[in-house]
UniProtKB/Swiss-Prot annotation:
HAMAP family: Ribosomal_uS5_B. Part of the 30S ribosomal subunit. Contacts proteins S4 and S8. Belongs to the universal ribosomal protein uS5 family. This is Small ribosomal subunit protein uS5. One of its GO terms (molecular function) is structural constituent of ribosome. Pfam families: Ribosomal_S5, Ribosomal_S5_C. The gene is rpsE. SUPFAM superfamilies: dsRNA-binding domain-like (SSF54768), Ribosomal protein S5 domain 2-like (SSF54211). GO terms for biological process: translation. PANTHER family: MITOCHONDRIAL RIBOSOMAL PROTEIN S5 (PTHR48277:SF1). InterPro entries: Ribosomal_Su5_D2-typ_SF, Ribosomal_uS5, Ribosomal_uS5_bac-type, Ribosomal_uS5_C, Ribosomal_uS5_N, Ribosomal_uS5_N_CS, Ribsml_uS5_D2-typ_fold_subgr. Keywords: Ribonucleoprotein, Ribosomal protein, RNA-binding, rRNA-binding.
């Protein structure tokens, strides 16, 4: 029974390919190609993960990246309604990411990679700006760092030892 529940949860996850890179190595017989893939997995309800993998075949790199993403799932519980509770600015290596809450009806105003991450996280209204590096891996890490750093109003009041209504 438990196994079927877990497999049902896995079935709800949607997998998207963010980036595919092809590298070549010059050898005696010619060029040897290898591939790397950055994969995003999410259910649109706050569960999200990413994986990076390399392989000699593109399909193997995508499959391995998907497996890695499923192993690295996180849950974002601090989403309030369709947006985030507060503004956040995060640095990750050379990339900076600014996330701002938005009113209902705004939609996701962000670049393509960050937009995909936020859609798969289940955020509906947000404004995001990517600053600094446009390295895909650093942008993804910055987005995950930003989403994990969010705290709900209730959490903040509890930390400040203020009674909340």
């Amino acid at each position: 029974m438990t196994l079927s529940k877990n497999s049902h949860k896995e079935d709800q996850l949607e997998e998207k390919v963010l980036v595919v890179n092809r590298c070549s190595k010059v050898v005696k017989g010619g060029r040897k190609f290898s591939f790397s893939a950055l994969i995003l997995v999410g259910d649109g309800k706050g569960r999200l993960g990413y994986g990076f993998a390399k392989a000699n075949e593109l399909t193997d790199a995508i499959r391995k990246g998907g497996e890695a993403a499923r192993k690295n799932l996180i849950t974002i519980e601090s989403l309030e309604g369709d947006s985030i509770p507060h503004e956040v600015l995060v640095d990750q290596d050379g990339a900076q990411l600014l996330l701002k809450p938005a009113k209902p009806g705004t939609g996701i105003v962000a670049g393509s990679r960050i937009r995909l991450i936020l859609e798969m996280a289940g955020v509906k209204n947000i404004v995001a700006k990517s600053l600094g590096s446009n390295n895909p891996m650093n942008q993804v890490k910055a987005a995950f760092k930003a989403l994990l750093s969010l705290s709900s109003r209730k959490d903040v009041l509890t930390r400040r030892k203020v009674t909340h209504d």
